[in-house]
Amino acid sequence: MHRITILGATGSIGESTLDVIRRHPGRYAAHALSAHRQVRKLADQCIEFRPARAVVGTAEAARELETLLRDASVATEVSYGEAALESIAADAQTDAVMAAIVGAAGLRPTLAAARAGKRVLLANKEALVMSGRIFMDAVREHGATLLPIDSEHNAIFQCLPADDPRYGRGVAKVLLTASGGPFRTRDPATLHDISPDQACAHPNWVMGRKISVDSATMMNKGLEVIEAHWLFGAPAERIEVLIHPQSIVHSMVAYTDGSVLAQLGNPDMRTPIAYGLAYPERIDAGVTPLDLTLAGGLHFEKPDLARFPCLGLAFDALRAAGVAPAVLNAANEVGVEAFLAGQVRFTDIAGIVRQVLEEAPSGPADTLEAVLAADALAREAARAGVTARAAAR
């Protein structure tokens, strides 16, 4: 029996992970689950899966969860806070950790899992975007196994040489595909009128609201470019983004002999989740098999950086190196949060990120303290940008 900790169990990745676990009751068990605010959903998950431990964000949420579980006669141990998250990530009874907390909040527990030598199923982008070198060093030094769960990086992992899935050895280029989001063909002059609900209506994938907005701005793909650099050792000039509206080709690897290997499948996150859970084996994920005769044509185009300036900003941050990717991520999180709250326009997100990137001090990302300090300064600057733009509306 493989015991799984899920950081971010009530989000879309967490729920999909539990669905795969549910399909294989003799193979996997949920050992620990975490959520921030969705206490009732977490309680329902604990009642069904009976984890040994559960973690929430606050003492108040912990009291509520304890009451719900006590009434259901469920003996799950409840705790709260950042230290508790790190504890379940490094728990000696856990075989694998699904790192699915969205945003910078997932950084410390994901790093704790790596330092504990766990099999880390990485769905959290920020661990690599903010502190790529620190995180990859921890994976190597502590013997952790790192398996990417983002559909694109999981596809690249499958297309690279199995014994050493990294750039080199005949690899010419890494090709990340992107759907283009809901505004791929919309007149750029009308993008300032986009509502949060429109931005969250992804044409192919079911995702949380923050990631849906990132997909609409293509910042999501920009963060994935930075991830690909750290995961596979590919330099920025060897990472290319292609718009692929059908979301069937999840990514590709081009080789120096002219070969291009691609991973295809229906757009369902249970496929890469099942791959990560069972690696190097394969298990049923509950996903409808791909029928290419029904899929029709597969189309590809280059992204328009005028329409999607966030993608260009991410490449800029990767080339700048140091704390620049952490600054990019922090400013974007603040901008997206403000947009979802109705404080700024959709098109203000890129402007906030650009301004913070231009004004933030540079420096090496050689310690976690340096990364978190840069993150804090960037958030403060981004909030000032939000205030200025909100006042000007």
Curated annotation (Swiss-Prot):
It is an enzyme of class 1 (oxidoreductase). NADPH binds at T10, G11, S12, I13, R37, Q38, N124, E126, G208. Pfam families: DXP_redisom_C, DXP_reductoisom, DXPR_C. Its cofactor is Mg(2+); Mn(2+). One of its GO terms (molecular function) is NADPH binding. Transmembrane segments: none annotated. Keywords: Isoprene biosynthesis, Manganese, Metal-binding, NADP, Oxidoreductase. GO terms for biological process: isopentenyl diphosphate biosynthetic process, methylerythritol 4-phosphate pathway involved in terpenoid biosynthetic process. InterPro entries: DXP_reductoisomerase, DXP_reductoisomerase_C, DXP_reductoisomerase_N, DXPR_C, DXPR_C_sf, NAD(P)-bd_dom_sf. Pathway: Isoprenoid biosynthesis; isopentenyl diphosphate biosynthesis via DXP pathway; isopentenyl diphosphate from 1-deoxy-D-xylulose 5-phosphate: step 1/6. 1-deoxy-D-xylulose 5-phosphate binds at K125, S151, E152, S179, H202, S215, N220, K221, E224. Its EC number is 1.1.1.267. Belongs to the DXR family. Catalyzes the NADPH-dependent rearrangement and reduction of 1-deoxy-D-xylulose-5-phosphate (DXP) to 2-C-methyl-D-erythritol 4-phosphate (MEP). This is 1-deoxy-D-xylulose 5-phosphate reductoisomerase. It comes from Cupriavidus taiwanensis (strain DSM 17343 / BCRC 17206 / CCUG 44338 / CIP 107171 / LMG 19424 / R1).
